[in-house]
Amino acid sequence: LPISDMMRRAGMPIKTVSITSQKEVKGAHGITIIADMLYEPQNIVDIDWLILPGGLPGTTHLGEFKLLRQLLKSHASVKGNIAAICAAPSVLGDLGLLNGKNATCYPGFESHLAGGTYTAKAVEVSDNIITGKGPGMAIAFTLAIIVKSLGKDKADRKSVV
């Protein structure tokens, strides 16, 4: 929720997407979110960022969703921006998208950062990939996305945080 809120406050157009057959998605701790849209390949166009939320079992579902895996690989192949927080950087590692990059993740998922270098930092920016350690780092994670997209001045605005 803070990621979507802060990005919208910064003026970044975002769409939350459900990979299930329903817009209503329940998170790891029982928080229900209504996604803006369902994942339909024809609607996934003009992407600036692919952002993966963490948590379980959500991260597992993201990693198992074939169309998302294909989209992540395709987006990465053209140096598209990708961000993942908490357990979700493991999806990037499993796809080989962290090769040669620094990354961080929720404690216990370090072994899934294949090809990457685990740094234990709160947030890691490595080329086109941003990773965040966990839910407590959501604000810093989102600010890194905003800085990379719009510059530091935009991220420093009081209305963003």
Language-model features: locations:
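Active-site-adjacent pocket-lining segments in enzyme domains
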Residues: 5-19, 35-161
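Short active-site-proximal "capping" loops at secondary-structure junctions
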Residues: 19-25
